[in-house]
Amino acid sequence: MTSKLDQLRAMTTVVADTGDIEAVARLKPVDCTTNPTIVLKALGTPMFADAIKEAVAWGKKQGGTPDAVAAAVADRLAISVGAALSGLVPGRVSTEVDADLSFDTEASLAKARAIIAAYKERGIERDRILIKLASTWEGIRAAEVLQKEGIDCNLTLLFSKAQAVACADAKVFLISPFVGRILDWYKKSTGKDYTPEEDPGVLSVREIYNYYKANDIKTIVMGASFRSAAEVEALAGCDRLTISPNLLDELAKDEGKLERKLSPENKTSVAKIIVDEKTYRWQMNEDAMATEKLAEGIRAFAKDLGTLRAMVSKELQLAAA
C-alpha cells in the first residue's frame, strides 16, 4: 500500500510550507511557501549563518538611515532563504511582500518588483517565484497590476469568499485560503470541536474551490494553514495544498486509503458574482471571523518582520563596533 502522501501527490500538487532546507530535500515538494515567520525561523539555523554574515557585510556598504539599511538587509536575507529553497524544488517559491505594506498598493508594487529583481540578480527568473500579498483590497489591486506585468502572485491571509471572488476578478495566479486559522476562530467562538467534515476552514476552501470550478476560473486554489493531517485529507484533490513538514511526515507514515474529496468533475452550479470595492469592504465587515483573522495575520507577520529587522540591526551594530 502506498502512503497517504504519495496518494495525495497523485491528485494534488504538494507544496511545503517551510524554510527548513533539510525537510524540503527529504520530502521533495513541488513548490515551497515562505512568510516572515518561516524566514525568521530558517535564519535561526546554522545553515544560514554565512548568508547572515554576507548580508550584513553588504549592508555596511549601503547608504541610508540605520532603519532603511536594516530593512534592506532583511529583504536580502528573505531572498537568500527563497533562493536556497528554489535550488531544491522544481516549481515555485513564494516570497512575501512586507506585511506593513498591506494597505498600500503602490508601495506593494515597488516591493514586489524589487523582490523579482533581487531574485534575477541571483539567476532566478520570475517564473520560479510567486509574490505573496495579503488579500486586502489594496493587496489584490497590486496583484492585478503585477499579473499584467507577468509577475505571478499568491494571495494569502484569505478567509472569505469575498476575498476569493475579488482575487478571481483580478485574475491572480493563485490564492491561499486558510483552513486551520478559521477553525481556531470558530473553536474559540463556539467552544465546540469539529470533525473534518464539519470543519469551517475545510468547508470554506471547498466552497471557494467549487465556485472557481463552476465558473471556469483559472486561479489556482492552494489550501493553507493546516492544524491536522485530517484537515489535509478532507481537501484531497484541491489544486494545491501547502503543508508543514510535520504533517507531511505524518501523511508519509500513514498507509491507509486516501479518498479524493475535491474534483473539477464534481462541481455544482453556482452563479458568478462581482465583488467591487464597496461590496468587498461590506462583506468583510459583516464577516467577523475573516476581518479578525486578516487583521491578526497581518499584525503577526509585521511583528516577525520587525523581529527580523531588529536582529539585523543588532548584527549591523556588532559589525560596526
Swiss-Prot record:
Active-site residues (renumbered): K132 (schiff-base intermediate with substrate)
A GO term, aspect molecular function: transaldolase activity
Cross-referenced PANTHER family: TRANSALDOLASE (PTHR10683:SF18)
UniProt keyword list: Cytoplasm, Pentose shunt, Schiff base, Transferase
Keyword Cytoplasm: yes
Protein name (database record): Transaldolase
Predominant location category: cytoplasm
Keyword NAD recorded: no
Localization in the cell: Cytoplasm
Transmembrane spans: none
UniProt organism field: Rhizobium rhizogenes (strain K84 / ATCC BAA-868) (Agrobacterium radiobacter)
Job description of the protein: Transaldolase is important for the balance of metabolites in the pentose-phosphate pathway.
Record-linked SUPFAM superfamilies: Aldolase
Catalyses which reaction(s): D-sedoheptulose 7-phosphate + D-glyceraldehyde 3-phosphate = D-erythrose 4-phosphate + beta-D-fructose 6-phosphate
Pathway(s) the chain acts in: Carbohydrate degradation; pentose phosphate pathway; D-glyceraldehyde 3-phosphate and beta-D-fructose 6-phosphate from D-ribose 5-phosphate and D-xylulose 5-phosphate (non-oxidative stage): step 2/3
